[in-house]
C-alpha cells in the first residue's frame, strides 16, 4: 500500500476515502467508491481506468454493453497495482434470459477483461424492457423500481 504520509492533507484525505470499503455478509469487502466506464470509448476507458487506479481508486465498473471491457482489463493490468487490490465489476446484458446465455456472456467478459477473475457480476438493469416499458399499466411499478 502507498505511503500516504508524504501526500498533502487534501490528497491524503482523498486517498483515504477511496480506500474505504463495505463489508458484505460473507465478509468480503467492496470499495465504497468506484470508477464507472459507461459511455466511455475504449480509449477513454483505458486512460481513465489506468489514471484512476494509479491515483487511489480500487473499484472499476464496466459491462458487456459498454463495449470497453478489453480496454478496462488492459488498464488494470498496466496500472502497476496488483490485480488482487482492484475490485472489478461487470454486467451481463439484461436481455439474456437463459442460463447458458449468462454463462456465455460471463465467459466472454472473462476473456475480454483478461484478468483471471471478475470480483462481481451483475445483471445489467434487470427489468423486462418490452413488458415493463411499453405498458402504461406498469407505470407505477416501473417508477417504484427504477433504482432497483
Give, region by region, the residue ranges found by the protein language model.
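Short acidic, gly/pro-rich beta-turn/loop elements at beta-sheet edges
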Residues: 45, 98-100, 133
Amino acid at each position: 500500500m502507498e505511503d500516504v504520509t508524504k501526500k498533502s492533507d487534501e490528497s491524503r484525505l482523498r486517498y483515504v476515502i477511496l480506500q474505504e470499503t463495505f463489508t458484505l455478509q460473507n465478509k468480503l469487502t467492496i470499495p465504497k467508491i468506484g470508477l464507472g466506464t459507461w459511455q466511455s470509448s475504449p480509449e477513454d476507458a483505458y486512460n481513465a481506468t489506468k489514471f484512476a487506479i494509479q491515483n487511489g481508486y480500487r473499484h472499476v465498473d464496466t459491462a458487456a454493453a459498454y463495449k470497453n471491457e478489453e480496454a478496462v482489463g488492459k488498464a488494470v493490468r498496466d496500472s502497476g497495482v496488483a490485480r488482487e487490490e482492484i475490485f472489478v465489476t461487470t454486467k451481463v446484458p439484461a436481455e439474456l434470459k437463459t442460463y447458458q446465455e449468462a454463462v456465455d456472456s460471463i465467459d466472454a467478459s472473462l476473456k475480454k477483461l483478461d484478468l483471471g477473475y471478475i470480483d462481481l457480476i451483475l445483471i445489467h438493469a434487470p427489468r423486462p424492457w418490452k413488458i415493463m416499458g411499453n405498458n402504461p399499466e406498469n407505470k407505477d411499478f416501473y417508477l417504484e423500481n427504477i433504482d432497483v
